[in-house]
């Protein structure tokens, strides 16, 4: 089992944790419908970058 040789100082502990910060996911607004969606994903209505790429079940 791994055991530390020396105690890690609060500064080094903070540096170790500096990469653990959470980031907010990128959210985009669809220009045609005004709905929000994740970047590089289609909106719930099936639109992507102003074009309808997926038909709704009601339209099919």
From Swiss-Prot:
Superkingdom, taxonomy of origin: Bacteria
Single biological process term from Gene Ontology: translation
Protein name: Large ribosomal subunit protein bL32
HAMAP family linked to this entry: Ribosomal_bL32 (MF_00340)
Disordered: annotated span: 1-60
Presence of the UniProt keyword Ribosomal protein in the record: yes
InterPro entries: Ribosomal_bL32, Ribosomal_bL32_bact, Ribosomal_zn-bd
Molecular function (Gene Ontology), one example: structural constituent of ribosome
Keywords: Ribonucleoprotein, Ribosomal protein
Organism encoding this protein: Paracidovorax citrulli (strain AAC00-1)
GO cellular component, one term: large ribosomal subunit
NCBIfam families membership: rpmF_bact (TIGR01031)
Biased composition (Basic residues): 9-19
UniProt record similarity statement: Belongs to the bacterial ribosomal protein bL32 family.
Source lineage: Bacteria, Pseudomonadati, Pseudomonadota, Betaproteobacteria, Burkholderiales
């Amino acid at each position: 089992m791994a055991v530390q040789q020396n105690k890690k100082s609060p500064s080094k502990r903070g540096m170790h944790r500096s990469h653990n910060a959470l980031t907010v996911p990128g959210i985009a607004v669809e220009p045609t419908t005004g709905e929000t969606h994740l970047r590089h994903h289609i909106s719930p209505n099936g639109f992507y970058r102003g074009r309808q790429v997926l038909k709704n079940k009601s339209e099919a």
